[in-house]
Amino acid sequence: MRKGYLLGWMLLASSVCMGAGLPQKINTFPITDVRLISGPFKHAESMDICYLLGLDPDRLLAPYMKEAGLQPKAENYPNWENTGLDGHIGGHYLSALSYMYASTGDEEIGKRLDYFLSEMKRCQEASGNGYLCGVPNGKAIWNEIKNGKIDANPFGLNNRWVPLYNIHKTYAGLRDAYVIAGKEEAKGMLIALTDWMLNTVSALTDEQIQDMLRSEHGGLNEIFADVYGLTGKKKYLDLAKHFSHRVVLNPLLEKKDQLTGMHANTQIPKVIGFKRIADLDGEKAWSDASDFFWHTVVNNRSVSIGGNSVREHFHKADDFSSMMTSEQGPETCNTYNMLRLTKMLYQTSGDMAYMDYYERALYNHILSSQNPVQGGLVYFTPMRSGHYRVYSQPQSCFWCCVGSGMENHAKYGEMIYASRKGELIVNMFIPSVLEWKEYGMTFTQETSFPEKESTRMVLHTDKSKKMKVSFRCPEWIDKSKVAFAVNGKKAEATLTDGYYTIERKWQDGDAIEMTLPMTLRAVQLPDKSSYYSFMYGPIVLAADMGKERLYGQFADDSRGGHIASGPQLPLQNMPVIVGEENNLLSNLKKVSPDKLEFALTGVYPSRYEGMKLKPFYQTHECRYMIYWELVSKEELGQRQKELAEVEKERAQLEQATADMVVCGEQQPESDHFVEMENSLIGSEQGTPWRETREWFAYKMKSKGKPVNAVRIESFSDAARDADVYVNGVKIGSVQGKNTLHTLLLPKELWKASEWEVKIMRGKSEVTPKFRAVRMILSKNLSLNE
């Protein structure tokens, strides 16, 4: 495995030098050269092995078998795996197995990887033309596209659920099987599948391909660039550029942030592709565009844990209010992809800002997204005070964040160490062993960080060597207290460009010790509103707010099971800090020198005085708080009154609602099996909408609650109208001059458990712009809205 892996990794890593590519300033180590040895990351890795081996490979392969015309050995898994996105987890699974095998050398993982890849190869060979995917009835859609029939929208293509996104997972799995795990046969499979795509789009114009790219397509441009990097054949680079979405790229080239309202994780993989193309082809402007995107998202659109987006979409950068109130906070997939982009930018720049973000997101979002006992994976991490997270169950849940989540915990070793011109760089303080084969050296990092504020590095070498060993100087460290020792004796380190460096002749058994004095920080939301999160070193602190009514905490296989849909605790009852910003940190005291536990004072209501905070990554199976609002004594009463009014209205509507879909948002509409004809979506000041010149429809459910009406939110000019049908029965019309419409259902539909709500064009050429559709019990609402 190791020899094959090194070949693939070196080919891809060195491909940036194929022509006028951008040079790498920092080199990361092959993940096979790093082994975790203890600590929370090692535990997460072990839990992930159990998760991977607990899945039935034949059930994951079933969609591929069906599309290849072969007899499946088992039925599809449920959830997203049998409702239109069939096979997407199979690609993630191949990537996760590849990373885990490279990271651990685990024999059972290796056997599973070999079996999965061999069965995929059997499917590809049966197809006869290089095609390999699990998209239901995929051959029909690809023939339509080949013949120029393209009907694209952000979450569909020719009436299928994002088939380009789906097939991207297969491409990525094959690439990782070769580049990461060294499986030679995967390279040929990857090239064959890429040639199939070349043939499929060969007759399409650039305009047609750009139209097709309106549908979510993952990072296909990155994959095709990688194939160019592996083969040197320019046709693949040209394909990568054709698959680069100009609607996203062009504003970034002009340093414009036009992200508001966009589906966040649709865009990040595209930007990874822009960066990969730049690295290979020397397109510095594309690299700069990727860098602008990164700084925009990290500095202006992210919360303290490193995550971004609400309800999967970028909200307005100057208004984080939805982040503080929604039960659908940052999506784990987003941070998975932001870390991939961060690694690429760090390698070509060496800028410490990238590593500071990487470390913060790794501890506080990625590590925290796995249940440390049950092993389940998290989709949304709400920032709403007093809410909670939902964990996947291995045999029931097959969301995108399960796929990327399986990969997340298989590659913790990839950024701990780096090198440049014979200099070893220690970027993160994680117990691990690095084998630097080129120099015949082994480095063992022993640490209990962040519980203990120090790390120790032991060197083993065949012969003495003079070289530099550098340790990252993180943003959170107290530089005045940093100290080094070599073999127990104080040593001097030079601080240059964000690294502490010791240069000397090293002997076998030499040990370097570094203190890591952490500082306490209060991190304000980027919109400068009065919400603060506390960090100790790189660690975000959180409060356990109890285990009250954690409904659906372990998800079932329903389409909305990934959402924490239990009661939202009233925000006016959540603790706030009463005081001033300049004294904020004085409210937080460390409880014990040996534990990462803090007590928070100056809190209202008084019952929360002295509430305990601990690392968020240790906070599980409970409601929690990450952000506290800071108010002055004078503001407190009015602020509580305002919150109470807003929460009363929200709670009333929540209690009345059985089911709801946000119009124009990808996952809510997909979860409600949206269908449409001649319909458009858009966003206005961060608010999504859908309109139609014909019709669109959703499947809605009662979920055991009484329903007697449909409530519709819309906006537009007064000239627009629409007709509303439920299960084929017209229940009324809506006029553009109104924004809220409550339409009673016929009594014969009250006891139904499912409905099709269909909105059709009325007398006007186009309907109003619709924001949301709810199935409600109308006694709680006015019928004259």
Predicted regions and their residues:
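Bacterial Sec-dependent N-terminal signal peptides
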Residues: 1-21
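Aromatic (Trp/Tyr) and acidic
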Residues: 21-107, 111, 142-180, 217-235, ...
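Extended, charge-enriched "interface" segments that sit outside catalytic cores
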Residues: 124-125
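Asp-box/WD-like beta-propeller blade repeats and closely related beta-sheet repeat scaffolds
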Residues: 138-161, 187, 191-211
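Active-site-adjacent structural elements in folded domains
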Residues: 157-158, 203-210, 253-261, 321-330, ...
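C-terminal beta-rich recognition modules with glycine/proline-rich loops and embedded aromatic residues
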Residues: 290, 355-364, 369, 373-460, ...
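Short beta-strand elements bearing conserved aromatic residues within extracellular beta-rich modules
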Residues: 469, 482-484, 722-724
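Beta-strand-rich ligand-recognition modules
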Residues: 489-509, 515-529, 678-707, 711-780
